[in-house]
Amino acid sequence: MAAAVIEENGRYLIARRRGDAPLAGFWEFPGGKRRAGEALEACLRREVEEEVGAIVQVGDLIDRAVQPYSHATVDIHFFRCRLAQGAPRALGCEEVRWVRAAELAGYRFPDANASVIARLAAAS
């Protein structure tokens, strides 16, 4: 899996998972599952466009987390990204928000996001 850590003007883009998805209602950084043979960066560009309707430029890998859940074990690669085109909006998610790093802890994220959230908060 790949997730986009998109920062703009000191805020990060987060998306709330749909009610019919695993971990429904939790917040996450936009992204998703990689298809067979797909590069992580290509996966991330595709998933962000499907989920929030924006095109991103994928930068450096900033964190990775392997986390077991009741429905699956996930291996998420978090990439620093920047918006290249489009204004994010909820397409494949319930809602999107721009929040400061210090505010991320106030949102309910899946456990796999804990280390990247701590890293962002420490850097702010």
PLM feature spans:
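Conserved N-terminal beta-strand and adjoining loop/helix that marks the start
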Residues: 1-12, 33
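C-terminal lobe/hinge of AMP-binding adenylation domains
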Residues: 17-18
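Active-site-adjacent beta-strand/loop module that shapes the phosphate/pyrophosphate-binding cleft
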Residues: 55, 64-89, 95-97, 101
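A conserved beta-turn-beta hairpin within the catalytic core of GNAT-like acetyltransferases
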Residues: 22-26, 98
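Charged phosphate-binding loop/patch that engages nucleotide di/tri-phosphates or the phosphate backbone
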Residues: 112-124
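Conserved beta-strand segments that form the floor/walls of ligand-binding pockets within enzyme
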Residues: 13, 28, 78
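The catalytic Nudix box helix
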Residues: 29-61, 100
